[in-house]
Amino acid sequence: SARLGVTAMAIYRYFKNKAAIEHELVDLVVGDYDVINHNRDDWVEWLYTTYAKMRHALCNHPGVMPLLDNASYQGGNALTVMDRILQELRRAGLSERQAAQLFHTLMAYMVGTVVLMNEEARRAIVVGKSNTNTAVTSRSRKLSFEMVSLSPYPHIAELAPHLAQVDAERQFRESVLQIIKSVAAS
């Protein structure tokens, strides 16, 4: 604020309170990534691409994650995204219940993967790797398993090599497609 020649409180001339700033920040990130403006002939591919773009946006802005609980459905950009997703789900023939369930299930899954990816990115930086490609992430996971004794945890020890090699991008796609298939069949 000093560099701009204003006080730290000057922002409140434009926003009612801290919550209003947070809502606008979340909505700005949602709007900047334009997650729904893409063409896919197949509604399943359209939906996957939309959630993959949301995931990418949140991974690029991890500071927004703590703000999602209060601000995610209140801004115009966020509401536009939600409305368009629901429109596509209904257009695909899903019932109201299925559309609502699929929207929330995919949102919860996507946010959960972002939390894990952000933690892996933070861990990679701590061990001296600034990027988060699959090889770096796998090494980081492997190192985290090697840093603790797994003898009291035989199942983790048995699966550690496989857990370290999970390809997050491929896993995200496969899981989103499986969730869509499961909800659409219910």
Give a label for each model feature:
Residues D34-T80, E96, F103-L106:
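Hydrophobic alpha-helical connector segments
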Residues D83-E119, R123, K129-S130:
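Mid-protein regulatory/catalytic core that forms ligand/cofactor-binding pockets
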Residues S1-A20, E24:
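Helix-turn-helix
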Residues L28-D32:
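Short, basic, alpha-helical segments at the C-terminal edge of helix-turn-helix-like DNA-binding modules
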Residues R3, A108-G112, S182:
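A short structural micro-motif
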Residues R91, E119-S186:
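C-terminal peripheral helix-coil segments that are non-catalytic and often amphipathic
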